[in-house]
């Protein structure tokens, strides 16, 4: 049976609507009928066919990894799921037999493959994933929010890596993940949450999500903002979401001694770092990849159930046939999360 899917068909800029064979389910898998998908920054990289994509993405391949859907098929070895369950899923498929997998640190599996990165993705009418990777969505969480659990998970994993209660938090990069991380920090009890960027549209989104200050670094000095807030000792926790070298070095300059930094943004491999700041301030830097399985997922659901409101971050909806408009909007930088409706 042929189904609709968005695929990377050619090694050049673009993504194409295609017909592909419906995926086949194994004994340990779930077959999911996709309801909504969201466009990730990774999908934009794949669309643009940048250096990372050229080195990573097999062509042709169905792309996409942010989704919510309904279980319509269950492998014979699977327990704990029923037809009709509403699910999203962990996009990192892990091996189960390396040291980290067996030690319960699944997110650090050295043999990880990615849905929509190096195996068939979710921008399709149907998706097959191992049942281990599926996460049931509580009834009170909307399809829209469930479809962005993957990037929300990046935000939660990054933000909750260190204690935030009563701390002053600096977030560099007001993309959707940075803004969600800021909202999480505020929700769990940080004191001042300051986010920096140069994109005024996204800084406005951050203001809607309740940050203490959203700072356009082209127009305002971080030091002046800290002074306005009565901060005398620098930031306690830094969340680097931009991959921008000047943003990271500004973070190092403005951290308190003993500060802690979570690093999610991917900088150029040859980024110059002022290591004196790291060494003499005794900074702790932690690299973040993906989500902790499945601690981050439980935290995500609980945060929303306890009143965290992410709805402002979802700014655009399109029918999947209008996917090109969705990608154009994401590439413009004048959007939060963009959702494609498959129903």
Swiss-Prot record:
Its EC number is 1.1.1.103. The keyword NAD applies. The record marks 150 as: Important for catalytic activity for the proton relay mechanism but does not participate directly in the coordination of zinc atom. Pathway: Amino-acid degradation; L-threonine degradation via oxydo-reductase pathway; glycine from L-threonine: step 1/2. Zn(2+) 2 binds at residues 95, 98, 101, 109. Zn(2+) 1 binds at residues 40, 65-66. Belongs to the zinc-containing alcohol dehydrogenase family. This is L-threonine 3-dehydrogenase. It comes from Vibrio atlanticus (strain LGP32). The lineage of its organism: Bacteria, Pseudomonadati, Pseudomonadota, Gammaproteobacteria, Vibrionales.
């Amino acid at each position: 049976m042929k189904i609709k899917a968005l695929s990377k068909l050619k090694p050049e800029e673009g993504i194409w609507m295609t017909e592909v064979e419906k995926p086949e389910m194994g004994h340990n898998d779930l077959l999911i009928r996709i309801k909504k998908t969201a466009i990730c920054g990774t999908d934009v990289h794949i669309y643009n066919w940048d250096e990372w994509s050229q080195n990573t993405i097999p062509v042709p391949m169905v792309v996409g990894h942010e989704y919510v859907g309904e279980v319509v098929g269950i492998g014979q070895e699977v327990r704990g799921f029923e037809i009709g369950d509403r699910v999203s899923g962990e996009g990192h498929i892990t091996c189960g037999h390396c040291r980290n997998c067996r030690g319960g640190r699944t997110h650090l599996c050295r043999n990880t493959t990615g849905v929509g990165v190096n195996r068939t993705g979710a921008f399709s009418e149907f998706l097959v994933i191992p049942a281990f990777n599926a996460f049931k969505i509580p009834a009170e969480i909307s399809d829209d929010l469930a479809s962005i659990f993957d990037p929300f998970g990046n935000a939660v994993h990054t933000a909750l890596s260190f204690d935030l209660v009563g701390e002053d938090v600096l977030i560099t990069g007001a993309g959707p993940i940075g803004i969600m991380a800021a909202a999480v920090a505020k929700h769990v009890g940080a004191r001042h949450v300051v986010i920096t960027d140069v994109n005024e549209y996204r800084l406005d989104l951050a203001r809607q999500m309740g940050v203490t200050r959203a700072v356009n670094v082209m127009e305002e000095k971080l030091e002046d903002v800290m002074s306005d807030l009565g901060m005398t000792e620098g930031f306690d926790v830094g969340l680097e979401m931009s991959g921008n070298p000047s943003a990271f070095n500004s973070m190092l300059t403005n951290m308190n001694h003993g500060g802690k930094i979570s690093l999610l943004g991917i900088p150029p491999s040859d980024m110059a770092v002022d290591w004196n700041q790291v060494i003499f301030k005794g900074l702790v830097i932690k690299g973040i990849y993906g989500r902790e399985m499945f601690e981050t997922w439980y935290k995500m659901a609980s945060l929303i159930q306890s009143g965290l409101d992410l709805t402002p971050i979802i700014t655009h909806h399109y029918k999947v046939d209008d996917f090109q408009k969705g990608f154009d909007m994401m590439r413009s930088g004048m959007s939060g999360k963009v959702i494609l409706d498959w129903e």
